[in-house]
UniProtKB/Swiss-Prot annotation:
This is Alpha-1,3-mannosyltransferase MNN1. Glycans are attached at N50, N225, N254, N383. Pfam families: Mannosyl_trans3. GO terms for cellular component: Golgi apparatus; Golgi membrane. The gene is MNN1. It comes from Saccharomyces cerevisiae (strain ATCC 204508 / S288c).
C-alpha cells in the first residue's frame, strides 16, 4: 500500500513538472518563429533598400524582364509598367528570395506568390494599381489603338488629343492605350466580380479606417516600391466604385446607388402603359405572365454588370429580344404575325433608343401583338393558332451615356439589345428571321445545354479578312500573365487548331483555323442565337467593343463575327452548331457544265439563308423573310432594268405580277442545298434581282480526273418531308400576307377591355 502511494505521488510530481516544461517550450517556439519572421522581413527590407539605393531595372533577372515586358532588354520606355500584372514577376521574385533564405518549415504557405494569394487580395492589388500606374487610364475605344507594327491608327505621331509625339512617346502611347490593356482589365473584372464567389467591389474602394488592416496589400506595396519607387500607391483613394465603373465602361451612363433607378430602361407595357421610372415587371417563369411590378434596389457590394444581371433575372427567365427601328416596321408586323400563328408564349422585349421608334409605331405594334382582330390569313394548316404576344418596349436612352448614344446605329444597335435586355436567358432574332422551331427549343439544344450559347453557321463564302485585321484581333487574346495570375486562358489551343486535320477539330477550333489561318470571314450568322446572360455578360461587352473600335469596325461584314470573337477573347465557352447554312427553294439544273468532268449540277437561288438541324432533316429557321424579296423598293427598281435582267423579268407579264412574286408569294420549301464548304459553290445571282441580295447554292457531281467512272459528290441536296413542308408553307403564308396597313392604335375602351380579359384569364 505504501508503495502504491509513493507511485501516485511521483506521477503527480511528474505531471506538475511537465506542464511548465511544455508551456515553456511553446513560448520558445513562438519566440523563435517571431525572430525568424523578423529576420526574413528584415532581410527583404534590407534587400529592398539596397535595390532602391544601388540597383535599377538593369540589374533585374532577365527571366523576370521577359515575363513582365516580353524582352530581357532594358529600355526606359518599354519597361515602364502599364499594367498591374507587369509588376507581378518582380513581386514573385522577392517571394522566391524570402523562401530561399527562410528557416520556416511552412515557408511556401507563409510566403505566397501572387497567384497563390486570395482572389480578393489579387483583385484589390490589380484594380488599385491601375490608378497607381496612371489615373487617366481608360477603356474608351474612341481613345484606344491596336498595338501592331502598323502606321495606321496613330495619326502622324499624334495622340488622341492631337498633341505631337516623338518616337519614344509614341511607343509609350501605344503601350498605354493598347486595346489589349482594356481587354485585360475587363477580363480581370469578369474574374473578380462576375464569376463564382465574387469579390465585394466595396473592398476595392474601402473607407480609410479599413485600410490599416490590409496586411497583404501592405506587403505587396512595400515590395514593389523597392523596384518602382516613384509611384503613389494611394492614388486610387481619390476615386470611388462608381467612377471606376464609368472608366471601365464609358458607354454606360454615370450613376450611383441612389440614382441607379434613373438609368433603368423606360418600359412600355403590352397595353401601351409607360411604367414609372425605375419600376420593372416581374414575370412568372412558368406562365410568362406578369405577377407584380417592383423597383430594383442597387446592391453596392456588386458591380454594375452583376446588378444588371441580377435585375434581369428578377424580371424574367427566358424570352425573345429584338432590335427594331422605324424603317423595319413592316417586317416587324410580319414577325409578330408569325409568332402569333406558331403559338409563342415567351415574352418579347424590343430594346431601342427613344428616337429609333416613334410612339405611333409602338402603338401599332401593340395592336398587331394583342388585337383579336389581327388574324392570320387563311391557310391549309390544321394546327394554326393566334396567340396574343407579350411584347414590351425598353427605351435605353437613359442607360447609355449621352456622348455614346450616336455610336449604336445600324448593325451596332444589336449590342444594346443583347447587353441591356432584362432577361436572364434570351433568344435574339433579326426582324426578318423566321423560326419554324418553337423558340423555347433553342434553349434545349445540345450546344446550349453544354455552354449556355448556341450560334449558327454562315454561308461558306470565299471572302477573306484583311491581314491587318487578323493581327489586331490576335492582340486581344489572353496572355501568359493573365493565365497565370487570374486563370484567364485561351480556350482554344492555336497550335492544335492550326496543325491538326480539319476532321479532328471541334466546330469552334475549325472556325478559329479558318478565320485566323486561312483568313476566311463569314463564319457565324447572327440572325438567330441564344445566350445565357447570367453566365456570359462580359463576352458580349468585349464583342461590342471590337465592333465599336474604329480599326476593327469594318474588318468583317456587320456584327456577326464579333460575337464569337468576343467569347474567344473573354475565355468563355461557346458553341456553334456544326452545319453550314444553305439555300431553300426549287432547284434548277445547271447547263453551263464544266466540259465532261462536271456530269450533273443543280442550284437553288434565294434571298434566304436556311439553317438545318444537326441531323440535316429539319429546317430550323431562315434569315431573309418568307418571300422572294424583303426590300420594299426592289421590285420597282428591278422592273426598270434591262440587259441581263431582261431574261428574269420576261417571266412576268406585268409589273404587278412581278411585285406579287417578290412580296406576296411564299418561297418554295421543297428543297435545301447545303454546298460543299471546301468548294466555291456559292455565287451571287447574275441577274441582280432583289437589289443583288439573291445568292445561289450549288450541288454537283464530278468525274474524277482521268477516271472512267469514279465520281465525287459536292454538297447535299435535301428534300424536306411533306409534314414539315405543310408547316413551313403555312408560316411563310402568314408572314407574307401580314400587312402593316392592318394595324392601328387601340382606343382606351379597347385597352380596358383587353386588360380585363387578361386579368380574368390569369
Amino acid at each position: 500500500m505504501l508503495a502504491l502511494r509513493r507511485f501516485i505521488l511521483n506521477q503527480r510530481s511528474l505531471r506538475s513538472c511537465t506542464i511548465p516544461i511544455l508551456v515553456g517550450a511553446l513560448i520558445i517556439i513562438l519566440v523563435l518563429f517571431q525572430l525568424v519572421t523578423h529576420r526574413n522581413d528584415a532581410l527583404i527590407r534590407s534587400s529592398n533598400v539596397n535595390s532602391t539605393n544601388k540597383k535599377t531595372l538593369k540589374d533585374a533577372d532577365p527571366k523576370v524582364l521577359i515575363e513582365a515586358f516580353g524582352s530581357p532588354e532594358v529600355d526606359p520606355v518599354d519597361t515602364i509598367p502599364v499594367s498591374p500584372l507587369e509588376l507581378v514577376p518582380f513581386y514573385d521574385q522577392s517571394i522566391d528570395t524570402k523562401r530561399s533564405s527562410s528557416w520556416l518549415i511552412n515557408k511556401k504557405g507563409y510566403y505566397k506568390h501572387f497567384n497563390e494569394l486570395s482572389l480578393t487580395d489579387r483583385c484589390k492589388f490589380y484594380f488599385r494599381t491601375l490608378y497607381t500606374l496612371d489615373d487617366e487610364w481608360t477603356n474608351s475605344v474612341k481613345k484606344l489603338e491596336y498595338s501592331i507594327n502598323d502606321n495606321e491608327g496613330v495619326d502622324e505621331g499624334k495622340d488622341a488629343n492631337g498633341n505631337p509625339m516623338d518616337e519614344k512617346s509614341e511607343r509609350l502611347y501605344r503601350r498605354k492605350y493598347d486595346m489589349f490593356q482594356a481587354f485585360e482589365r475587363i477580363r480581370a473584372y469578369d474574374r473578380c466580380f462576375m464569376q463564382a464567389n465574387p469579390v465585394n467591389i466595396q473592398e476595392i474602394f474601402p473607407k480609410s479606417d479599413k485600410m490599416s488592416k490590409e496586411r497583404v496589400q501592405s506587403k505587396l506595396i512595400k515590395t514593389l516600391n523597392a523596384t518602382f519607387p516613384n509611384y503613389d500607391p494611394d492614388n486610387f483613394k481619390k476615386y470611388d466604385q462608381f467612377e471606376f465603373e464609368h472608366k471601365m465602361f464609358p458607354f454606360i451612363n454615370n450613376f450611383t446607388t441612389e440614382t441607379f433607378h434613373e438609368m433603368v430602361p423606360k418600359i412600355t407595357s403590352p397595353f401601351g402603359k409607360v411604367l414609372e421610372q425605375g419600376f420593372l415587371p416581374k414575370f412568372d417563369h412558368k406562365t410568362g405572365k406578369v405577377q407584380e411590378y417592383f423597383k430594383y434596389e442597387y446592391d453596392p457590394s456588386k458591380t454594375f454588370w452583376a446588378n444588371w444581371r441580377d435585375m434581369s433575372a428578377k424580371v424574367a427567365g427566358r424570352g425573345i429580344v429584338l432590335s427594331l427601328g422605324s424603317n423595319q416596321f413592316p417586317l416587324a408586323v410580319k414577325f409578330i404575325a408569325s409568332l402569333r400563328f406558331e403559338g409563342n408564349t415567351l415574352p418579347i422585349q424590343v430594346v431601342y433608343r427613344g428616337d429609333e421608334l416613334s410612339q405611333e409605331l409602338v402603338d401599332k405594334l401593340i395592336y398587331a401583338a394583342r388585337s383579336p382582330d389581327f388574324k392570320p390569313v387563311e391557310n391549309n394548316y390544321d394546327n394554326s393558332t393566334n396567340v396574343p404576344q407579350e411584347i414590351w418596349f425598353l427605351d435605353v436612352s437613359n442607360t447609355i451615356h449621352p456622348k455614346w448614344r450616336g455610336d449604336f446605329g445600324s448593325y451596332k444597335s444589336k449590342w444594346l439589345v443583347v447587353l441591356l435586355n432584362l432577361l436572364q436567358e434570351f433568344v435574339f432574332l433579326d426582324i426578318d428571321a423566321i423560326s419554324y422551331e418553337k423558340i423555347d427549343n433553342y434553349f434545349k439544344t445540345t450546344e446550349y445545354q453544354k455552354t449556355g450559347t448556341v450560334f449558327y453557321r454562315e454561308r461558306a463564302l470565299r471572302e477573306n479578312v484583311n491581314e491587318r485585321c487578323i493581327a489586331r484581333y490576335e492582340t486581344l487574346l489572353p496572355r501568359n500573365l493573365e493565365s497565370k495570375n487570374f486563370q484567364n486562358s485561351l480556350l482554344i489551343d492555336p497550335d492544335h487548331a492550326l496543325n491538326e486535320c480539319d476532321n479532328t477539330l471541334t466546330t469552334e477550333e475549325y472556325i478559329f483555323k479558318a478565320f485566323f489561318h486561312h483568313r476566311r470571314q463569314h463564319q457565324l450568322e447572327a440572325g438567330l442565337f441564344a445566350v445565357d446572360k447570367s453566365k456570359h455578360t462580359i463576352p458580349l461587352v468585349l464583342a461590342a467593343m471590337i465592333h465599336l473600335a474604329k480599326n476593327t469596325a469594318h474588318c468583317t461584314h456587320g456584327d456577326k463575327e464579333n460575337f464569337w470573337l468576343g467569347f474567344l477573347a473573354a475565355g468563355h465557352t461557346y458553341a456553334l452548331q456544326g452545319v453550314y447554312s444553305g439555300a431553300i427553294g426549287d432547284y434548277v439544273k445547271k447547263t453551263d457544265l464544266n466540259g465532261k468532268r462536271q456530269e450533273a449540277a443543280v442550284e437553288i437561288c434565294s434571298g434566304q439563308i436556311a439553317h438545318m438541324s444537326t441531323d440535316k432533316k429539319t429546317l430550323l429557321w431562315v434569315n431573309g423573310g418568307g418571300t422572294f424579296c424583303k426590300h420594299d423598293n426592289a421590285a420597282k427598281d428591278d422592273w426598270k432594268k434591262d440587259g441581263d435582267f431582261k431574261k428574269f423579268k420576261d417571266q412576268f407579264k406585268t409589273f404587278e405580277e412581278m411585285e406579287k412574286y417578290y412580296y406576296i408569294t411564299p418561297i418554295s420549301s421543297k428543297y435545301v442545298i447545303l454546298p460543299d464548304p471546301k468548294s466555291d459553290d456559292w455565287h451571287r445571282a447574275s441577274a441582280g434581282a432583289c437589289g443583288g441580295y439573291i445568292w445561289c447554292a450549288t450541288h454537283k457531281t464530278l468525274l474524277k480526273p482521268y477516271s472512267y467512272n469514279h465520281r465525287t459528290t459536292h454538297g447535299e441536296l435535301i428534300t424536306l418531308d411533306e409534314e414539315q413542308r405543310l408547316h413551313i408553307d403555312a408560316v411563310n403564308t402568314v408572314w407574307s400576307h401580314a400587312n402593316k396597313d392592318n394595324t392601328r392604335s387601340f382606343t382606351e375602351e379597347e385597352i380596358k377591355e383587353l386588360e380585363n380579359s387578361r386579368h380574368e384569364q390569369s
